[in-house]
């Protein structure tokens, strides 16, 4: 199985950029909540946009804060009522510390004149890394990205009220399925293509449908990222 994503034309996302720049004229920091289901390409897009926008400004004005850092740790999942289910369905909305996420968004909104820290996620160990992302005063555009950032249930919906711009990256289900199964396989999370597909259908595709059915109205719906090549026997 081989899969790539076309590098997007950054100008296709100028509406998002222009809104952020306009807001910067009147406030010190702009918070963007960029949501999309599993396999939508949101992490890829955010990295591309951050690089392009930082180059335009000539400084590191953009900082990305992924939702992945707010996974409950494996140790915390093992304290759930059903730890086996929690581990098997890790990535579902309830396996994230949404209260911690909301608290951090609120902090980033309020405090702009000193360094703050957010957690990252280390895929090698399968757990969050506390205070791994440093947000500095020069980081005036913060892009929070993740599956559940636009959910219409608290505390996710409380965080939504703090975003200056709510953006959504849609994806076709067949595309998402191919991307996520490929990711599970190449990361070593699944040993075979069949196992990767089964895990994707059991968990990620359900999460994608949940995101689509339970989100607030975004301010901007972004252009989908396109698949360049998919070569596989099963997808």
Swiss-Prot record:
Enzyme Commission (EC) number: 2.7.1.48
GO MF annotations in UniProt: ATP binding; cytidine kinase activity; uridine kinase activity
Disulfide bonds: none
A Pfam short name: PRK
Transmembrane segments: none
Biological process according to GO: CTP salvage; UMP salvage
Main location: cytoplasm
Matching InterPro entries: P-loop_NTPase, PRK/URK
Presence of keyword ATP-binding: yes
Binding-site residues, ATP: 36-43
GO CC field: cytoplasm; cytosol; nucleus
Keyword Iron: no
Location(s) in or outside the cell: Cytoplasm; Nucleus
Pathway(s) the chain acts in: Pyrimidine metabolism; CTP biosynthesis via salvage pathway; CTP from cytidine: step 1/3; Pyrimidine metabolism; UMP biosynthesis via salvage pathway; UMP from uridine: step 1/1
Keywords associated with the record: ATP-binding, Cytoplasm, Kinase, Nucleotide-binding, Nucleus, Transferase
Catalytic activity, as annotated: uridine + ATP = UMP + ADP + H(+); cytidine + ATP = CMP + ADP + H(+)
Family recorded in the similarity comment: Belongs to the uridine kinase family.
UniProt protein name: Putative uridine kinase C227.14
Native species: Schizosaccharomyces pombe (strain 972 / ATCC 24843) (Fission yeast)
